[in-house]
Amino acid sequence: MDQIVIMWLYIWGNLNEYEKNIVKLLTDNDSLTWNELLDKTKYSKSTLTKYIDSLNNKAIIKYNHNKTYSLNDSMLKTWLKHKKEIEGQYPL
């Protein structure tokens, strides 16, 4: 378990604020469509596409058959929810 946490700390630490925001939204909402992400992030279409592609290429998020995006790893989601519950916010 500790090795998994260390891995996610490293990955989380290497995400930029745009990517972290998308991951936080998917943690809070389970899955969202591209348009829902566009609305919630207030990013431009090109910016959202850029960071969705980046997170997808890093295997952090996945595109589902129902045309939604979600986190690819349930351990990441569990870790982020735990951090938010314990510390009152997501890791910085």
Cite the ranges covered by each PLM segment.
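Winged-helix-like regulatory helical subdomains adjacent to P-loop NTPase cores
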Residues: M1-Y43
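Secondary-structure transition/capping residues
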Residues: T33-W34, L48, K62, E87, ...
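Short, amphipathic alpha-helical interaction segments positioned at domain boundaries
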Residues: M75-L92
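Short amphipathic alpha-helical interaction segments
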Residues: T41-K58, Y63-N66
